[in-house]
């Protein structure tokens, strides 16, 4: 018997991959809240033609992890319900940052690299030259903060405006804390090996050209369609919540027991078994997969495995305010785009804003999502801000930046506590140590979810698949 803690997208995916293994008995999934889907939260307003997304809303279609997600979507019968945004779509081409008192369009082609594009004071081409002729770092580094790495290789402007704002969008994090080795491992490694990013990428590309030609796995199905149609990003009709809902239906059909509103009380490892107590009920398991945040798992392991618990608890998380705004006017935005990000150097209380109605059809509505806080949540809002306080800040920023001064016709304020892990310098080393501890002690425990190997939907689904493969192995009891 296998149990899974958490019914977010990674926990449900783990259940799906376990079901595919054909074990003698289907797994059971325990979820502490009253709903499934985790941080994926879609609120639909079918009569009005729009949706609010409190969490992720789009998925990227490129790379091995993305292909795995596309395969899963097709396998569960959602292939015909995918809603792609093509690379020539305005939401794919137009991405902005708010800096120096104005919205600035980021370059989307090579022409933007050879001319000066605000907020930068010189062409981005010169940043590449700085890296190319900058020489090697004075000492070999095991890891480095993203900001430090980019400033060292490409200059302060790129670090301040491009990378810092990008990390606000990826993980609501501070580039001066986030690990380059974890988020951009290939760039970090080629820089350390070859003494520069541009030089290293060129040399690596030349060296691998012939090797890769014979190793390319042909794309099939939805992944092949995504490439041939040149998707930039995609969602699913009805909002991203459709994916966990569909996974639940598949698991229900496979007689997987999904229990919500339950409390995990104790985890104890005995030999090669796991003793799990949930709502006073004792279960003896062959294996346990945890998809809950690392700090929550740490509480249950502290008594028996304090060293492991300490490392799990050391992974930091941040709070994010997400404010959905809907206006009954489709023509409020002067610039059509995916949205904009705000670099921390601007010292504003928001991380950015997504133009949902530019990405997907919201009928005769302008729909925006304002994100705020993250690594700076307490600095701006204190410990316990009210929803009214966050709404007021969001509306003020929308007014100042987008010149929208009317009240929204509907809105939703979400205060998401400890929702995004921060992959600080040394994160990869910590995660490697956590997994090594589990192997060294032969614990029948698998880990998946955003705490460890990536925050995106693709990352957590792949982490579920890898975890299932690792914990099941040859033992199919």
Feature locations, PLM:
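Dinucleotide-binding Rossmann-like beta1-alpha1 core, especially the glycine-rich loop
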Residues: 47-136
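Active-site/ligand-binding neighborhood in enzyme catalytic cores
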Residues: 91-93, 125-266
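N-terminal Rossmann-like FAD-binding beta1-loop-alpha1 element of flavoenzymes
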Residues: 1-29
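Mid-domain catalytic core of redox enzymes
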Residues: 21, 260-383, 388, 397-401
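Conserved flavin/dinucleotide-binding core of flavoenzymes
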Residues: 42-44, 106-114, 335-337, 351-477
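Glycine-rich FAD pyrophosphate-binding loop
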Residues: 19-46
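Conserved Rossmann-like nucleotide-cofactor binding loop
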Residues: 10, 35, 295
């Amino acid at each position: 018997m296998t149990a899974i803690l958490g019914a977010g997208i990674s926990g449900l995916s783990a259940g799906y991959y376990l079901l595919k293994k054909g074990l003698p008995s289907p797994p059971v999934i325990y979820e502490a809240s009253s709903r499934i889907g985790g941080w994926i939260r879609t609120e639909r307003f079918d009569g009005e033609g729009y949706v609010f997304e409190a969490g992720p809303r789009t998925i990227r279609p490129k790379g091995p992890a993305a292909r795995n997600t596309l395969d899963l979507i097709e396998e569960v019968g959602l292939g015909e319900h995918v809603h792609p945004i093509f690379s020539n779509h305005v939401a794919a081409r137009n991405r902005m940052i708010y800096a120096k008192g104005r919205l600035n369009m980021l370059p989307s082609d090579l022409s933007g690299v050879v001319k000066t594009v605000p907020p930068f004071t010189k062409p981005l081409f010169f940043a590449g030259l700085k890296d190319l002729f900058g020489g090697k770092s004075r000492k070999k580094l095991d890891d480095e903060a993203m900001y430090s790495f980019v400033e060292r290789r490409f200059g302060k402007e790129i670090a301040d405006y491009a990378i810092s704002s990008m990390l606000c969008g990826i993980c609501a994090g501070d580039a001066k804390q986030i690990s380059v080795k974890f988020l951009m491992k290939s760039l970090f490694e080629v820089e350390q090996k070859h003494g520069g990013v541009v030089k290293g990428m060129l040399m690596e590309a030349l060296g691998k050209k012939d090797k890769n030609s014979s190793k390319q796995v042909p794309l099939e199905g939805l992944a092949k369609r995504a490439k041939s149609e040149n998707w930039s990003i995609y969602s699913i009709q009805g909002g991203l919540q459709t994916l966990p809902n569909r996974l639940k239906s598949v698991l229900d059909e496979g007689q997987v027991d999904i229990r919500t509103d339950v409390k995990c009380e104790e985890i104890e490892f005995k030999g090669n078994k796991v003793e799990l107590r949930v709502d006073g009920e004792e279960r003896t398991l062959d294996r346990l997969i945890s998809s809950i945040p690392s700090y929550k798992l740490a509480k249950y392991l502290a008594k028996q495995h304090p060293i492991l618990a300490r490392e799990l608890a050391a992974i930091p998380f941040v709070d994010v305010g997400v404010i959905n705004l809907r206006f009954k006017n489709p023509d409020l935005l002067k610039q059509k785009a995916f949205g904009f990000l705000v670099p921390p150097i601007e010292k504003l209380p928001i991380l950015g804003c997504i133009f949902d109605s530019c990405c997907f059809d919201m009928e005769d509505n302008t729909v925006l999502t304002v994100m705020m806080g993250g690594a700076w949540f307490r600095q701006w809002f204190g410990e316990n801000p009210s929803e009214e306080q966050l709404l007021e800040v969001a509306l003020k920023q929308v007014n100042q930046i987008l010149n929208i001064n009317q009240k929204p016709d509907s809105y939703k304020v979400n205060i998401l506590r400890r929702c995004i892990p921060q992959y600080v310098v040394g994160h990869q080393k910590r995660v490697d140590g956590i997994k090594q501890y589990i192997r060294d002690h032969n614990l029948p425990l698998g880990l998946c979810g955003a705490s460890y190997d990536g925050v995106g939907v693709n990352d957590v689904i792949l982490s579920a698949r890898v975890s299932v493969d690792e914990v099941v192995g040859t033992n199919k009891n």
